[in-house]
């Protein structure tokens, strides 16, 4: 299967939204609420520390006063449908 990472940049009222989606099947419901906790990982400790999403969310919220969220969703690229997780970064536009 071809691995896809799909980027979308959208304007939503006074906000810019960056969506980063993949086709890796999504995040299981039983861990979705935990992925932003520090040191949470589903990988072996030698492959990750579990602080990437925690730090990403803190940067978006504290430095940019924005939000970082995720959802499992279907998306389409060049008439092909894919399913995976989508991370959305939402930041207020500054004029």
Where are these regions (language model features)?
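Glycine-rich ATP-binding loops of the HATPase_c
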Residues: 64-78
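Short beta-strand-loop-beta element adjacent to the nucleotide/active-site pocket used for signaling
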Residues: 2-18
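Short C-terminal beta-strand
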Residues: 78-94
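Short conserved segment of the HATPase_c
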Residues: 27-39
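Short alpha-helical Gxxx[C/S/T] motif in the catalytic ATP-binding
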Residues: 52, 56-57
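Glycine-rich ATP-lid/hinge loop adjacent to the conserved G-boxes
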Residues: 39-49, 64
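Detector for a conserved hydrophobic position within an alpha-helical segment of the HATPase_c
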Residues: 60-61
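Acidic ATP/Mg2+-coordinating residue in the GHKL
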Residues: 22
């Amino acid at each position: 299967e071809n691995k896809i990472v799909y980027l979308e940049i959208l304007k939503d009222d006074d906000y810019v939204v960056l969506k980063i989606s993949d086709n890796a099947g999504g995040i299981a419901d039983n861990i979705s609420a935990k992925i932003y906790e520090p040191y949470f990982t589903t990988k072996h400790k030698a492959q990750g520390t579990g602080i990437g999403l925690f730090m990403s969310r803190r940067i978006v919220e504290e430095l940019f006063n924005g939000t970082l969220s995720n959802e499992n969703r279907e998306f389409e690229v060049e008439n092909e449908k894919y399913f995976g997780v989508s991370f959305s970064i939402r930041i207020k536009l500054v004029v």
